[in-house]
Amino acid sequence: MRIIFAGTPDFAVPSLRAAAQRHEVVAVYTQPDRPAGRGRGLTPSPVKLEAVARGIPVFQPQTLRSPEALATVRKLDADLMVVVAYGLILPKAVLAAPTHGCWNVHASLLPRWRGAAPIQRAIEAGDTETGVCLMQMEAGLDTGPVLLSQRIEIGEQETGGQLHDRLAALGAQVLSDGLGLLRAGIRPVAQPQPDDGVTYAHKLDKAQARLDWAQPAQELARRVRAFNPWPVAEAILAGERVRLHGAVALELAHQHPPGTLLAASKQGIDIACGEGALRVRVLQREGGKAITAADYLNARRDLPALR
């Protein structure tokens, strides 16, 4: 089959590899190169790097809404377009251009967590399971019928980064299964999404990563896990702003104001929350690298009462 692949971040790379394994990927669409790093030089997306390494033609339009962009898609004469975390809206004309339309690999069990950040929002909400859906795309935001799906459990201490990697691999497998069926002349049965159970995974930003100690410790611990490795939770601890890379909630009754340091040891730094306490295990000072609580205490000799 002739396939157009559209994707941008690391999450999409395993799916591109799966598509290219037994099919002809005639073109890759990805976001334009963006400034990144200390030098702010233009940096290609992970998907572009993979496509270039495979010798696949790369297209990086600012939009797919122009007549020129549509003409290019049609000229590729594709059987199918596969979209994985691309980042641009596909107009109806593009969705209809390939023979079999457009498939999307989405990192949630739809209709739960439609939108941009389903992995992080699932952890933040305390979901115990999630998965991947292969969806036939339509004009709405992640509203199309589901062709195939797989579910997995979310680990009790699993971070957003760890779950991201597992779902990226699972998404590639689900896509491979779907492409195998289509190649054999079997079109997966499209199951409409139910009207109930719809939630939206709004895009992450750094402002959401600022923790408020007045919130319950369980909620804060989930946010620390969800926002690792990006945007990384941050809070005021012992008078300075730090980033939190690892923490667990403690069911601890106390009468202390939120933000009070309750105890500190090699096991972690315990901070009073609106309910319970948060034990910070790995943190990062401004301008520094991530360190253990023990190393942080060694650097903060001004906290003798907590040792």
Curated annotation (Swiss-Prot):
UniProt cross-references to InterPro entries, sorted A to Z: Fmt, Formyl_trans_C, Formyl_trans_C_sf, Formyl_transf_N, Formyl_transf_N_sf, Formyl_transferase-like_C_sf, GART_AS, Met-tRNA-FMT_C
Residues reported to bind (6S)-5,6,7,8-tetrahydrofolate: 108-111
GO molecular function: methionyl-tRNA formyltransferase activity
GO terms for cellular component: cytosol
Family per record: Belongs to the Fmt family.
Protein's recorded name: Methionyl-tRNA formyltransferase
Transmembrane intervals: none
Keywords: Protein biosynthesis, Transferase
Organism: Xanthomonas euvesicatoria pv. vesicatoria (strain 85-10) (Xanthomonas campestris pv. vesicatoria)
Principal EC category: transferase
Disulfide bonds: none
